[in-house]
Amino acid sequence: MSRDITKDIYGDLNYAPITLFGNKLNVGIIGAGRGALIKTRNFYNKGSNIEVLALEFLDDFYELDTNRVKLIKGCYKTQFIKNKHIIIIAVSESELINKIKLDCENHHKIYINSAKFNEGMGVIPVSRESKYISAAINTKVGNPRGAVLVANLITEYIFELDEFIKLSGEIRNNLKFEEKTKDSLLKFINSKDFKFFYDKNKIINVLKLFYDDN
């Protein structure tokens, strides 16, 4: 009898998506290997304040702005997590990982376990951005390279939609209708039909249908 072994391996991964403002985050990263560097750069590029704790650092860490990335040489102590919003566990020693996890749970910290992602509280998605759109991609089978593939495939489409999203956002922010008409118009300007008229350069004519004759 066949069965879906992915359920045994990954369990039921029920993501609860939330988008945080990177420049308001204090992030603690424990470990300074290649994986830690990748995650440091990810938060660095989003403007986060970062502290990295390790006994040794890759040379690449020293290329980052020291005003935003503080490198701390030393062993882990509970005090390290107390002023952080998110903790990245990027070490391989099981005993240390369990100690950090317990501290994070006791202090209500969001933590990511790089060694075994499903034993943490979440994962860092693959993100792609245009000027007006931000997208984050996860897989539900622990396949980060697969997430990169999907993100790359949709990137071109994101850029194609960029100016359309800008326009629909500007219209939304300048609507002066009563609530019922406004709601109806908002549904329309964020529909495939409206995108069709946008592509045909007929937006002005269509929008006039929502105004009085004057």
Model-flagged regions — what are they?
Residues G74-T78:
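Conserved SAM/SAH-binding loop
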Residues G47-E51, K84-S94, I133-G142:
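Short beta-strand and adjoining strand-loop segment in the mid-core
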Residues I38, K46-E63:
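NAD(P)-binding Rossmann-fold cofactor-contacting core
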Residues T139-N214:
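An accessory alpha-helical subdomain
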Residues I86-V91, I97-V123:
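ADP-ribose/adenylate-binding Rossmann-like module
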